[in-house]
Regions:
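Conserved beta-strand hairpin/beta-sheet module of binuclear metal-dependent hydrolase folds
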Residues: 1-49, 140-157, 174
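Cap/insert and terminal regions of metallo-dependent hydrolase folds
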Residues: 161-244
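Active-site metal-binding motif and surrounding structural segment of the metallo-beta-lactamase
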Residues: 32, 39-88
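Catalytic core of the metallo-beta-lactamase
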Residues: 105, 115-171
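Short active-site oxyanion
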Residues: 30-33, 86-90, 151-153, 208, ...
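Metal-dependent catalytic neighborhoods of phosphoester/phosphodiester hydrolases
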Residues: 69-77, 103-104, 219-227
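General small-molecule cofactor/ligand-binding pocket signal
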Residues: 6, 92, 113-118, 131-133, ...
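Active-site neighborhood of phospho(di)ester-bond hydrolases with catalytic His/Asp-centered motifs
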Residues: 34-38, 55-62, 94, 153-157, ...
């Protein structure tokens, strides 16, 4: 069994010179899936894998820092060198997100099967199972839990502490958790600080906490310190582009 996740982007709100916006490449046995496609993730994907090998894409919500590079993948599949009639791949997302994408360019349906998800959905990623939980964020947003071979990967997407985070995070070997702001910042509705991430990770008894979606003006090392103080003894890391985490 092989199961890994590679960070394609981890910057919150917008990409920077150093970091792409949110996106992850999930590899399970011989299959590859994308989870979110913020700005800059397309280029980073091409450094890691052949886009023709992708089996599907999940977009957590409609905000551009999680979706904008889906159009790069669409153009590559639609106008690129796949040759002949396209074989569609699944694009799972909240219905609101799918409606926005198809309204912008209805041609997207020629490259993707648009499949709405909600908190009751169960999806197969090859031999793995993906389940979803509603997060607390202004548009309809879902976090995802991917289970394979008795281990789990959890990703919050964007959320405040009121999101149904425990439903995806419990006992996860790797917990990709948003940490947009820091303890001293004004609260930002629909987002969390690094200490929140640490406390939730402890409560959910995760194996490793990986902080993602840090606002670009944050002191990243300070966020890491705050999360570690809230989660003593837990393995805590900062996400960085190209980081690969093995789960199996």
């Amino acid at each position: 069994m092989s199961f890994s996740v590679t960070v394609l982007g981890c910057s919150g709100v917008y990409q920077t010179r150093e970091l792409a916006a949110s996106g992850f490449l999930v590899e399970i046995d011989d299959g590859r899936w994308l989870v979110d496609m913020g700005g800059g993730t397309w280029r980073n994907l091409l450094l890691q894998a052949d886009y023709r090998d992708l089996k599907g894409v999940f977009l957590s919500h409609r905000h551009p820092d999680h979706t904008i590079d889906i159009w790069q993948l669409f153009h590559a599949r639609h106008y690129g060198d796949l040759g002949g009639p396209e074989t569609k791949i699944p694009l799972w997302a909240p219905r609101e997100t799918l409606d926005r994408l198809s309204h912008f360019d209805e041609g997207i349906t020629e490259s993707f099967d648009l499949l709405p998800v909600d908190q009751n959905s169960k999806v197969k990623f090859g031999g793995a199972r993906a389940t979803f939980a509603r997060m607390k964020h202004p548009p309809e947003t879902y976090g995802v839990r991917i289970e394979h071979g008795g281990v789990a990967l959890a990703y919050t997407a964007d959320t405040g502490i009121e999101g149904d985070i425990d439903a995806i995070a419990r006992d996860a070997q790797v917990f990709l958790c948003e940490a947009t702001v820091q303890d001293s910042d004004e609260p930002w509705w629909g987002h969390m600080c690094a200490s929140d991430a640490g406390r939730i990770a402890v409560r959910s008894e995760v194996g490793r906490l990986v902080l993602t979606h840090l606002r670009p003006d944050c002191d990243r090392e300070l966020s890491l310190q705050q999360a570690r103080r809230a989660a003593p003894g837990l393995e805590v890391h900062l996400a960085s582009d190209g980081m690969k985490l093995e789960l199996g």
